């Protein structure tokens, strides 16, 4: 049984930490910016709640983190009372935040100075994947640190793959988000067209999903998109943040992402419609308002 710390108990982190406790039987100490949520988690799963990231990370073998963005990540690691102030030699810090490859490299170097490991380990599978413990985890960092942390990561994962050196996990997640953005825009236009053409939508989806157009987004989102229900899953605000990271990285590495840039702007329109917290398949809403 390992001693594990968890920082960030949002819609993803809360159940992910729960799986480590329930499936792995590990000793957990959790920290959340809203202390009441950490207390709630501790009561539900039988762990401990810490007042600061530093307190949570003290003496831990593994420290997991799932927060909002690069700045949040820096705050809970190298900021005042950050986890790195108590990160012990030989520990491994596993970051499940979708963040930039640059911040991953920065924190990997900072952890190394402490004699600790750092893995950038963003996830795919959304809230449902987190709740069911079947996330896909793409991981960058040293191979030895990955092997050490892999059994704990598997508590909430369907697949955990070492992609290469530090930053490779975040870069792979960017590929994931680029692909999803294009798929959702295409599905939005297809459904919008089918509605305008007067087609039987369920029959049309049942037919084309057996062919080359099939995708996870089609199978899991067509019905809620058609019914205008977007109160679940991954929010527009977060998707736009992720696409911004992709576009920043593309400016550095020279990749051309014309469709991604366009969809990122479409998400800004959804935000202006008041849809920042809508699920990211709500791209279809802007077509209905044109």
Describe the function of each predicted region.
Residues 67, 98-178:
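Rossmann-fold dinucleotide-binding core
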Residues 1-65, 91, 96-97, 127:
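NAD(P)+-binding Rossmann beta1-loop-alpha1 motif at the extreme N-terminus of oxidoreductases
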């Amino acid at each position: 049984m390992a001693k594990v710390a968890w920082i960030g108990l949002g819609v993803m982190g809360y159940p992910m930490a729960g799986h480590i406790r329930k499936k792995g039987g590990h000793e957990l100490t959790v920290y959340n910016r809203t202390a009441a949520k950490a207390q709630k988690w501790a009561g539900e799963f039988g762990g401990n709640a810490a007042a600061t990231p530093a307190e949570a990370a003290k003496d831990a073998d593994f420290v997991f983190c799932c927060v909002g963005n690069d700045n949040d990540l820096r705050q809970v690691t190298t900021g005042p009372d950050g986890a790195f102030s108590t990160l012990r030699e030989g520990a491994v810090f596993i970051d499940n935040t979708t963040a930039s490859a640059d911040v991953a490299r920065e924190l990997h170097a900072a952890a190394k100075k402490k004699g600790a490991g750092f893995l950038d380990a963003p996830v795919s599978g959304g809230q449902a994947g987190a709740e069911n413990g079947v996330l896909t985890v793409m991981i960058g960092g040293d191979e030895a640190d990955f092997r050490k942390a892999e059994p704990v990561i598997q508590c909430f994962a369907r697949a955990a793959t070492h992609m290469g050196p530090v930053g490779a996990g975040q870069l792979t997640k960017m590929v994931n988000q680029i692909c999803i953005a294009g798929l959702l825009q295409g599905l939005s236009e297809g459904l919008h067209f089918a509605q305008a053409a007067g087609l039987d939508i369920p029959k049309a989806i049942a037919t084309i999903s057996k062919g080359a157009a099939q995708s996870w987004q089609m199978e899991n989102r067509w019905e809620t998109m058609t019914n205008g229900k977007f109160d679940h899953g991954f929010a527009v605000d977060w998707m736009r943040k992720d696409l911004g990271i992709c576009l920043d990285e593309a400016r550095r590495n020279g990749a051309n992402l014309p469709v991604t840039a366009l969809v990122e702007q479409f998400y800004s329109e959804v935000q202006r419609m008041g849809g920042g917290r809508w699920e990211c398949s709500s791209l279809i809403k802007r077509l209905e308002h044109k």
